Swiss-Prot record:
It comes from Pyrococcus furiosus (strain ATCC 43587 / DSM 3638 / JCM 8422 / Vc1). Its EC number is 2.6.1.118, 2.6.1.124. The gene is lysJ. Involved in both the arginine and lysine biosynthetic pathways. This is Putative [LysW]-aminoadipate semialdehyde/glutamate semialdehyde transaminase. It comes from the Archaea.
């Protein structure tokens, strides 16, 4: 069962390119919604994962394995968090973060943001904003409330000694590729510290893409919990929940979480990203789309939102016709989440194509 309208049947990928069942080639500026950070069929990554498939795939949570320590050794080169819970998806990372926050503080209230997206399982869905995701599944988990994103005064009013945690995306993805402003992030950090609550940064989409390992690093603020997913395994389902506090063993767990194949995928992905400096180079590849019908381009690095004056569906469709795959973030935002291996020339080629299609589409009388 698929929840998405069928558009293309893709059959193979190589680097930043994918091919459909008719043999047509596309530049992939979606990358599985930000997943394939090393592109498709990266030779080193594929080779190491093939070796792992022949060695050990799942061991079960009651056993240890060397791939976990290989992953942790690579992870420690990017972050200083003391504890990591390994799951299978971004929504699982968020569920873990919410459970850990309630366990650690003994409180129930979770504050999330308008236009936030944190996942589709019940806890993460309760923190998600858009009614189209929520309405059919009510009643959701009690104890959640939303405040306007980037509203300092609303944060001051909402965060109290009853609050277990505040969860937010440093750059809202599904919400339109909207960065948090510095004053707002600093206010969240100051208020949560003052009230004894925890600050959770959801980096499932923004992690790795903005020129720094975590987008929150741009704000010089350290959250209590960070969630990561999508690109961290370059396509193998895996997620991380990072904290500086321990959680009692047995309070949370997963059959597949932390399996050798997933840990190997993270280790190899991080090693290649670090060696090739792909995270740092992403900062230099941000493109600004210009045109009479463009309101603005926002985001950081290779997490890009192009805000239009009119709905973007026709632009997305025509770009696909011309061999470029892009995504949306609402009716009026084109979202780009390309592989980090994309070159400056290639991203500039995409920029020209997008500007050309926008001008062609909106230049028509119909």
């Amino acid at each position: 069962m698929s929840l998405y309208r069928k558009r293309l049947r893709l059959v193979k990928g190589e680097g930043i390119y994918v091919w459909d069942s008719q043999g047509k080639k596309y530049i992939d500026l979606i990358a599985g919604i930000g997943v394939n950070v090393l592109g498709h069929n990266h030779p080193e990554w594929v080779s190491e994962l093939q070796e792992q498939l022949e060695k050990l795939v799942v061991a079960g949570p009651m056993f240890d394995h060397e791939e976990k320590y290989e992953m942790l050794e690579e992870l420690e080169k990017f972050v200083t968090y003391e504890y990591v819970y390994i799951g299978n998806s971004g929504t699982e990372a968020v569920e873990a973060a919410l459970k850990f926050a309630r366990l650690y503080t003994g409180r129930k209230e979770i504050i999330a943001m308008t236009n936030a997206f944190h996942g589709r399982t019940m806890g993460a869905l309760s923190a998600t904003w858009k009614p189209k995701y929520r309405e059919d599944f009510k009643p959701l988990v009690p104890g959640f409330k939303h405040i306007p994103f980037n509203d300092v005064e609303a944060a001051k009013e909402a965060i109290t000694t009853e609050t277990a945690a505040v969860i937010f995306e440093p750059i809202q993805g599904e919400g339109g590729v909207v960065p948090a402003n510095e004053e707002f992030v600093k206010t969240l950090r100051d208020l949560t510290e003052d009230k004894g609550a925890l600050l959770i940064a959801d980096e499932v989409q923004s992690g790795l893409r903005t020129g720094k390992f975590l987008a929150i690093e741009h704000y010089k603020v350290e959250p209590d919990i960070v969630t990561m997913g999508k690109g961290i395994g370059n396509g193998v389902p895996v997620s991380l929940t990072l904290t500086n506090f321990d959680v009692e063993r047995g309070k949370h767990g997963s059959t597949f979480g932390g399996n050798p194949l997933a840990c190997k995928a993270v280790a190899v992905t991080l090693r290649i990203l670090r060696r090739e400096k792909l995270i740092e180079k992403a900062a230099e590849k941000f493109i600004e789309i210009k045109g009479e019908n463009v309101v603005l381009t926002r985001g950081k690095g290779l997490m890009i939102g192009i805000v239009m004056k009119k709905p973007v569906a026709k632009v997305v469709e025509e770009l696909q016709n011309r061999g470029y795959l892009v995504h949306t973030a609402g009716q009026r935002v084109i979202r780009l989440l390309p592989p980090l291996i994309i070159s400056k020339d290639e991203i500039n080629q995409a920029k020209s194509a997008i500007e050309g299609v926008i001008n062609d589409i909106y230049g028509r009388k119909n």
